[in-house]
Amino acid sequence: MLSIPEFYQGKNVLITGATGFMGKVLLEKLLRSCPNTKAVYVLVRHKAGQKPRERVAEMMSCKLFDKLRDEQPDCAQKVIAISSELTQPELDMSKEDQDTLIDCIDIVFHCAATVRFNESLRDAMQLNVIATRQLLYLAQKMKKLEVFIHVSTAYANCNRKQIEEVVYPPPVDPKKLIESLEWMDDSLVNDITPKLIGDRPNTYTYTKALAEYVVQQEGSKLNIAIVRPSIVGASWKEPFPGWIDNFNGPSGLFIAAGKGILRTMRASNNAVADLIPVDVVVNTTLAAAWYSGVNRPKNMLVYNCTTGGTNPFHWGEVEYHVISTFKRNPLEQAFRRPNVNLTSNHLLYHYWIAVSHKAPALLYDVYLRITGRSPRMMKTITRLHRAMMLLEYFTSNSWVWNNENTNMLMSQLSPEDKKVFNFDVRQLHWAEYMENYCMGTKKYVLNEEMSGLPAARKHLNKLRNIRYGFNTILVVLIWRVFIARSQMARNIWYFVVSMCFKFLSYFRASSTMRY
């Protein structure tokens, strides 16, 4: 059987979502570990006045591609930008570009999707479902196509507690929903959205479930596989540990915790935190395309790319490692010392929100106003609470995913491919991974230099001293007010003080008698 690099040798590959987090890592890994890949076509839209080619050039100049550029200085010549807008009819692609792709593409990786949990149903359907269908129509015309890989999510069927590696019946016929959306106005769509998504938490998981069904139905004549990653996090090993470049998912919460802004969150300490490193997802995806391309299985394979079943990690452990890492290696200009309390109790959660989030933010904004600056902390807290609300469904529940196909895929790799395209999460050491993840947010998201650590530690110690001083003054003031108004409190206070003096006198007397 061909090795994975041999399979990709001489192949033309198409990637959607190549400028996204996972797409970048997929592109880098493909070019670096399969150096004889002929060309990689990436669908990119115009953005902020930049042409697709300029966006790709800028992307490939970032730190993620440093190792690739060192090994293959001319690697950028293999990457061909195709102007495309996935939300437009026929992907807004020129006839010339369509003909090029139809004539030469061997492998398709469809990674593009909206990952915003609060996206409107219309927009989520457009990118996650309709764009997928249009890409499948284009793929059906490709003369040399060997395999089509659709990247979904392990939470597409989160309304089930036990999730098999199969495509489940959709909650509604995608075709009928698409037709209905054409005549509905936005107000009506928003009104019916809660009824449509039912027991799913958001439009993202709902539309990803519909997209899987579309892939199964519309791509029945194609050689297709689906990869379902869970919560995609920073890189484990490749191209280096801790690579992360966005605030999405848990990354933004980790940063908020490190800054001392996030103090409480609704979550179950014992719920499984099914984090999956991005390089594990990429290696699984490349291996899935190899297996389907070489063996051409009769049925479409689905791979649940998760960690909970083989190497479980819990949200309570996540909280511990995040806080301990940021206490040792603090972020610059922290608002408060890192400390987070996870709770699943509704009343306790709202109490801590008021005491630990809103009250300090309000006081800080008052201080900013007094000093002539613009208040900003309450706005930050409001944005943080929105993000927390979107994630609490996933931090409060656990799921069981079947991983038989993923384990089978791993067993089919040669010893060399297992080293180069490793996705065995049993080898993942969570404490080390979480430290690299947190440090990755510091270095690559916030762009903080490690040389600034001494100053950051000094600032954290200053915050600790301020906290101790404030708490001491607060306790003394409250106690003094309480004593002044209550005879019983005064009696207790005098009794405690007298007992302390008696104890000290006894201690001194006993010490003197020894000599």
UniProtKB/Swiss-Prot annotation:
Q: What is its EC number?
A: 1.2.1.84
How is it placed in the membrane, per its record?
Single-pass membrane protein
Tell me yes or no: is Lipid metabolism among this UniProt entry's keywords. Answer: yes
Q: Give TM regions.
A: 466-484
Q: Which GO terms describe its biological process?
A: ether lipid biosynthetic process; long-chain fatty-acyl-CoA metabolic process; wax biosynthetic process
Transit peptide: is it a keyword of this entry? no
Segments in the Peroxisomal topological domain = 485-515
Q: Where is the secretion signal located? A: none
What cellular-component terms does GO give this entry?
peroxisomal membrane; peroxisome
Mind listing the UniProt keywords for this protein, alphabetically? Lipid biosynthesis, Lipid metabolism, Membrane, NADP, Oxidoreductase, Peroxisome, Transmembrane, Transmembrane helix
| One Pfam family hit | NAD_binding_4
Q: Which reaction does it catalyse?
A: a long-chain fatty acyl-CoA + 2 NADPH + 2 H(+) = a long-chain primary fatty alcohol + 2 NADP(+) + CoA; hexadecanoyl-CoA + 2 NADPH + 2 H(+) = hexadecan-1-ol + 2 NADP(+) + CoA; octadecanoyl-CoA + 2 NADPH + 2 H(+) = octadecan-1-ol + 2 NADP(+) + CoA; (9Z)-octadecenoyl-CoA + 2 NADPH + 2 H(+) = (9Z)-octadecen-1-ol + 2 NADP(+) + CoA
Entry GO MF terms: alcohol-forming long-chain fatty acyl-CoA reductase activity; alcohol-forming very long-chain fatty acyl-CoA reductase activity
SUPFAM superfamilies given in the database record: NAD(P)-binding Rossmann-fold domains
- What ranges does the Cytoplasmic topological domain annotation cover? 1-465
Q: What does this protein do?
A: Catalyzes the reduction of saturated and unsaturated C16 or C18 fatty acyl-CoA to fatty alcohols. It plays an essential role in the production of ether lipids/plasmalogens which synthesis requires fatty alcohols. In parallel, it is also required for wax monoesters production since fatty alcohols also constitute a substrate for their synthesis.
Which family is annotated?
Belongs to the fatty acyl-CoA reductase family.
Question: What name has this protein been given in UniProt?
Answer: Fatty acyl-CoA reductase 1
Record organism: Xenopus laevis
Provide the gene name from the record: far1
